Amino acid sequence: MFNLQKYNYDTEEVVKKITNFKDYYGQKGGVTLSGGEPLLQPEYLIELCKKLKKINVHIALDTAGYGIGKYEEILKNIDLIILDIKDITEERFKNLTNGEIQKVWEFLKIANKLNKKFIVRQVIVPDLHYNKEYLIGLNNYIKKHIKNIQKIEFLPYHKIGDQKYEKLKIPNPYKNKKAMDIEKCNKLFEEFMKIYNNKNSAL
């Protein structure tokens, strides 16, 4: 609805802008907090969510689950978590994010304790995820670490993000990766859901 790029807004200014559009999105809409990684700004996130809840705004958090703590306080006012899975293995997660996957597990443990709803998203990178072995591992990972799942989605990896890495002059872990074909991604999702819906496939 509005572009916050290149500007710094305090929480009052953000809430004011959102309030101006409340008649537009009504009872069925709300606010999605994304990034970057919103969990890396816990104090701001906590303050903003408290103010949004006072005006009864539905709040979704789009996150990779990798932050710096205060998860319980953040999640108290979150209605829905849109979880972006980077990878399920410790080594590849480290290579792609330069972070530790255990931090994601910590976030998920607290979210599950609070019975938060999840939409789970997996971006499919052909070189990394387009194989049966990964699908089986992903099924086990989801069933082990994530509860109260409302929906699972596969998204095809694209190269649009390369420009962002170049602009910010930071290393791009996906630089040599190919884009994912949409039809192949859809077929892979169908194959995954057969595994996921098989009651005997859980760990």
Feature locations, PLM:
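Canonical Radical SAM [4Fe-4S] cluster-binding loop centered on the CxxxCxxC motif
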Residues: 1-8
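A general structural-boundary detector
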Residues: 1, 32, 91, 172-175
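Conserved AdoMet/S-adenosylmethionine-binding subsite of the radical SAM
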Residues: 15-160
